[in-house]
Amino acid sequence: MNNVDELTLDLPNFTGPLDLLLHLIRSQKIDIYDIPIAKITGQYLANLARWQTLDLQIAGEYFVMASTLLRIKSQYLLPKNDFIEEDQYQEDPRTELVEQLVQYSVFQRIAEYFKKRDEEMPITVAKDPSVSPKKEIEPLPLGEITSDELANTFKVVLERFKLRKPQVGKIEVHETSIEEMTSFLKNRLQKKRSTSFFDCIKSFQDLDQVIGLFLAVLELCRDHKILVKQNRDFGDLELEKVEINGK
């Protein structure tokens, strides 16, 4: 059975080369941390070749990724250096690509989550605001973080977390994870009025938990139940419970 022939895909279905690669990996249940580079490269190039025969306009970034895959594949074909001792660390040629795929996967899942939330909004029953209109239109206090700064800080969180390999290669974000992390954060803020994002994730082992907590923070911010502050660029996030009527 020819795996390349089985995985012929349509170009318009993908937003870019990382999206295509993730599809190839997920559809075959491949561990994202142990990619069979020769197999995936062959399937990727086969799809590019097919798109070219169909006269489809292929963005240059797809060819850049093709050259990256071929470079990684060629590094595996090179003979091992006998002068390097066995216990001396040699970086896996796939490392940078894996990091890109993991980060892309995370933000893809977050985007999917917000798209789902937007689709649910029309059927949401409105309720009276839990804070006064005056409070809602007040400018952000000094130190309070904007959504762009929050996103940039989350990238730093991913960098910190990348050395902790998740227990599974297939990265998923489920609604239950977000609900669990919302409860986790509420309980933490019940004990003390403020905490920090980095402190919260110290004991986490899975990237799924980090993503779930990040989305829980956004949910609680949106509902005006917590404030998020940052004292320096890309620094820790201070999470503070909003007191309403002394509660």
UniProtKB/Swiss-Prot annotation:
Keyword vocabulary terms for this entry: Cell cycle, Cell division, Chromosome partition, Cytoplasm
Gene3D superfamilies hit by this protein: 6.10.250.2410, Structural maintenance of chromosome 1. Chain E
InterPro entries reported in the protein's UniProt record: ScpA, ScpA-like_C
Compartment(s): Cytoplasm
S-adenosyl-L-methionine in keyword set: no
Principal location class: cytoplasm
Annotated Gene Ontology cellular component terms: cytoplasm
GO BP term, example: chromosome segregation
Quaternary state and interactors: Component of a cohesin-like complex composed of ScpA, ScpB and the Smc homodimer, in which ScpA and ScpB bind to the head domain of Smc. The presence of the three proteins is required for the association of the complex with DNA.
Family recorded in the similarity comment: Belongs to the ScpA family.
Cited function: Participates in chromosomal partition during cell division. May act via the formation of a condensin-like complex containing Smc and ScpB that pull DNA away from mid-cell into both cell halves.
Protein name: Segregation and condensation protein A
Gene transcribed to yield this protein: scpA
